[in-house]
Amino acid sequence: MLMTMTEFGRTVHQNGSLGTDHGRGSCLFVLGNNVAGGKVHGDVPELLVKDALEDRRDLPVTTDFRSVFADVAGKHLNIDRSHDIAMFPGWEGERFKVMT
């Protein structure tokens, strides 16, 4: 089992230095046995649609990373859903189903 993610996303549009700035939306990769693989999970915004970007530059956050982590912990490490609040204090979301 391997999960990888960045701590921040990148803006879609370039800044004045022809680079990009820290953004909100990002991606997370989950690889291994029992992963519902071969597809992109979640919502992928259409970048050419008017108002698809936040502040005309950021991908919107569509999935809370904790929901993916909780699903992987639950299925891969056999951690019961009742322990999600201990893993992520204050979080009350639902597990995002990436595991089979």
Language model features with spans:
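Feature marks hydrolase-like catalytic cores characterized by long aromatic- and Gly/Pro-rich stretches
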Residues: M1-T100
